[in-house]
């Protein structure tokens, strides 16, 4: 069922609001994907707080007008699914991970930090660890010397107790 003008304006407003908050937008062709697989992709996107939507390209072009993602408009051809996220890596990671298991989802382009990326750029962005992963690695590295020192002190205390007994 075609959308009337008010519905189209509502869709553009909704997507524009998401794009205004976004750091990353990823475009992927979804030609031939089964509905069940697309539902799994949407569920994974929701888990990662990625706004995932199939849009008419003309509506998507209007939504990105006047934003840092405007250069993506020339890539918006064919049946596309749009991944939009506030996290710099989440959209790229969700779409890239799904495209590895389903060859019918083809990454077309993306934009991060005002720069348009091709498929290789999106894949490179997806390979970067998330902020949480980096923080946990940093915490581990910082805790390692402290825990080693604590173990050395405990061993020294046990040795002193053994000598005293």
UniProtKB/Swiss-Prot annotation:
Question: What biological function has been recorded for the protein in this entry?
Answer: Forms part of the ribosomal stalk, playing a central role in the interaction of the ribosome with GTP-bound translation factors.
Q: Which Gene3D superfamilies does the record match to this protein?
A: 3.30.70.1730, 6.10.250.290
Please provide, alphabetically and separated by semicolons, the GO molecular function terms listed in this UniProt record.
Answer: large ribosomal subunit rRNA binding
- Which gene is annotated as encoding this protein in its UniProt record? rplJ
Which protein family is it in?
Belongs to the universal ribosomal protein uL10 family.
Q: Which organism is it from?
A: Burkholderia cenocepacia (strain HI2424)
Tell me what this protein is called. Large ribosomal subunit protein uL10
GO BP terms: namely: translation
The record's section on InterPro entries has: Ribosomal_uL10 (IPR001790), Ribosomal_uL10-like_sf (IPR043141), Ribosomal_uL10_bac (IPR022973), Ribosomal_uL10_bac_type (IPR047865)
Q: Which GO terms describe its cellular component?
A: ribonucleoprotein complex; ribosome
The organism's place on the tree of life at top rank: Bacteria
